[in-house]
Structure formats: C-alpha cells, structure tokens
C-alpha cells in the first residue's frame, strides 16, 4: 500500500474494484468534507 495516498482514495479504489457501495458509504461517513 502506498501510504502517500489518502485513505479515501484507497477506499474509493476498493469501491470500484469490488463494486460495493460500502466503500462510498465509508467515505461519506468518515470524510464528509472530502465529498462535498
């Protein structure tokens, strides 16, 4: 894992790779300022 990447980028990547909305839900819950 490249620690230089923000956690939300890794979560978003997991969302696209897994096709699972939980990745986006985690971003919305934990990093609301990043998605506004």
UniProtKB/Swiss-Prot annotation:
Keywords: Cytolysis, Dermonecrotic toxin, Disulfide bond, Hemolysis, Lipid degradation, Lipid metabolism, Lyase, Magnesium, Metal-binding, Secreted, Toxin. Belongs to the arthropod phospholipase D family. Class II subfamily. Its EC number is 4.6.1.-. It catalyses: an N-(acyl)-sphingosylphosphocholine = an N-(acyl)-sphingosyl-1,3-cyclic phosphate + choline; an N-(acyl)-sphingosylphosphoethanolamine = an N-(acyl)-sphingosyl-1,3-cyclic phosphate + ethanolamine; a 1-acyl-sn-glycero-3-phosphocholine = a 1-acyl-sn-glycero-2,3-cyclic phosphate + choline; a 1-acyl-sn-glycero-3-phosphoethanolamine = a 1-acyl-sn-glycero-2,3-cyclic phosphate + ethanolamine. Expressed by the venom gland. GO terms for biological process: killing of cells of another organism; lipid catabolic process. It is found in: Secreted. This is Dermonecrotic toxin LgSicTox-beta-LOXN2. Signal peptide: none annotated. Dermonecrotic toxins cleave the phosphodiester linkage between the phosphate and headgroup of certain phospholipids (sphingolipid and lysolipid substrates), forming an alcohol (often choline) and a cyclic phosphate. This toxin acts on sphingomyelin (SM). It may also act on ceramide phosphoethanolamine (CPE), lysophosphatidylcholine (LPC) and lysophosphatidylethanolamine (LPE), but not on lysophosphatidylserine (LPS), and lysophosphatidylglycerol (LPG). It acts by transphosphatidylation, releasing exclusively cyclic phosphate products as second products. Binds 1 Mg(2+) ion per subunit. Its cofactor is Mg(2+). GO terms for cellular component: extracellular region. Contains 2 disulfide bonds. GO terms for molecular function: lyase activity; metal ion binding; toxin activity.
């Amino acid at each position: 894992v490249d620690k230089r990447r923000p956690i939300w980028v890794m979560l978003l990547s997991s969302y696209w790779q897994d096709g699972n909305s939980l990745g986006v839900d985690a971003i919305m819950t934990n990093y609301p300022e990043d998605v506004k």
